[in-house]
Every structure is written in C-alpha cells, then in structure tokens.
Amino acid sequence: RLVGSEMCIRDSTITFDGIRVVIEESSKGVFDVGLFEEMGGEKEAVVKDLTLAGDMTIDAQKREDGYSLLAGSLAGKFKNGCIKNCTSKVDISFADNKGICTLCLGGLVGDLDSYGSEVEVALRGKVINEGNLTVNPCSDAYIGGVIGRATNYGKIFIKENVCVENKGDLTVQWKADAQPDHSYIGGVVGLFKTNETDIEHLHNWGNIRLDTQNTSATFNIGGVCGELTPHNYERIYPLDLYNAGNIEIKHDLLAEFSAIGGVIGSFGGSSFHQVVNEGKIIVSGKGCKYISGLLGSESSIHGNCYLYSCCVDKVGAYPVWNISYHPVTKQVPCKENHPTNQK
C-alpha cells in the first residue's frame, strides 16, 4: 500500500509485471488502486519524467456489497501537486459482474480531486496515456483515457506549456440489467467539473467502444470529455480540444437524455476555441436525439455557451452541437490568431 503526500518522483521507468488486484469482502467501501493509492494532500506531490508500462487487472467479481473504486496506473486519487512529462503504457482491465461498483478509471489517474483555495493541481509538459482500458462489465462509471473524473473546487492548471493526450482504446461493456444512472466516458477525461478556468491542449487518438446491452442508463460520451461543465454559474475557456478517435456504440441508446459528441458529450458555461473533430460516430442500434459532431448536448443548468468559428467538425455527419435551453448560446466569429500544440 503506497500513499504519497509530500514527495517528488522523477526520471524513472516502472514496469507493472502482470499486477492483479482482487477486491473481496471487507469493511472498506472505497478502494484506491494504482502505483500509489493516493497522492497529494496537505503537502503537494510532484511527479516528473516518469514512464509506467505493463498491465494491471482489477477483479471484483467476488465482491457482494456496493463499493467505489478509484483506479489509474499512477494513482487512484491525485489531490494536490504537479504531474509533468509522464507517460503510461499500462493496459488496465476491470471486471465486476454484479454491477455494484461506482468506478472512476483513468489511464493515469482515477480521480483528480482539487478542493480548497490553497490546493493546486497542475499538468505540465507531455502527459500521455498509451495503454488500453477494458471494462467488462460495469453499471456506474467515470472513465477517461487519462483521468476518469476531475473535480475542481481549488485550482487546476492545464494550459500553455502542456499537452494531455490519450492514444489508447477504451472498450466498455455495460451490465445488461444496470440501473438508469448517469455515466461518463471521454477519450481524455470522463467527467470534468471545475471552477472558472482555462483548459488547453487536450487531444485524443484512441477509439471509444461501448456496448450498451440495451440498458436504460444515461451516457455522456465525448472524444475528449464525456462532460465538461462548471460549478454554479462560472465559466470555462477551453482551447485546442482535438479528437481523431472513433466513437462506436453497439446496441441501443434508450435513455432520452444520453449525449454523444465528437469532442464533448454534455457541456455548459463555456467559450470554445479550436475544438476540432476528425473521428466518426458509429451507432449500430437505436440512437438518441443528442448526437453531434462536436458538442453533444447543452446542460439545462450551465448554459450561455459560445462556439467560435475556429471550431470545426471535419466529418460532418451530424450537427456541430445541440442547443435548446439558453437563448444566449450561439456560434460567433473568431478573431484570434491561436497558437496550438495540436499534431
């Protein structure tokens, strides 16, 4: 069991040699799984120039009671500090046949959780996931190629000299009789809820494959983020969000408010610059009305979004976005001369 509070890790290559984690009955209701269970706290953790490789299997099929699992190759939870120039090549698989888990799974970090005005989390340089994530099955999840869930009540810095990339595939099978919960799947981040902030240079090349098993669950799926929304009525300023991976949905999307976007599934309170999609959305069964080339569905609470003309869906099979709640939301000309880290 490794818990990191005040630490610095740098210039290392660590290989996971077939790590297998078995979750059985215990008094615990929350499990953190990764090289470190948890990093950061009152003191910051700093991770620099680290490469993780190998594979990790998480087996929860013997567990009988409901539980939460936060899992990533680096850490189950990251709360305070900096991740700079880190790459994961770890393939992660998870199995929970009973559908009793609330899962936060990311290629690097399961749950990035920033609380308090003195708490800062920064991503710097190249932060990359190249490992594949396989979930079979699950029923309540936040799954992202790099970060499963990011919740920011403190300060999160993902801007300027940074590029957060996912190059691994996400393959998810839902439990056939799962409850109709909301779940979030994104090529880079599953769910991102944040204070007012800039978010820059998030790129996805991995494919997302979901088998819904014809459940009534509500899915928020995006090539980059499953959902990107602010707390309360603050604003987000995303720049250079890019997706080249396909989103493939097998079986029906039965929930009325599922949202599928080439870049972001559910969105709100944002001014979008350089949002670009080159990946296809392939739905083999019954679709839903909120499928869009760039942005799936506008949040009924966090509206008033601006989509600037520098945003492009290069596939063109669907409308660029679905907006229906907020009259101020609109597409507007872009007068900026943007720099970009996009390949």
Regions found by a protein language model. Give the residues of each.
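Function-dense linear segments that define catalytic or interfacial modules
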Residues: 49-50, 55
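Consensus "Asn ladder" position of solenoid repeat domains
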Residues: 50, 86, 161, 166, ...
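Extracellular beta-strand/beta-solenoid scaffold signature
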Residues: 5, 22-39, 60-77, 96-122, ...
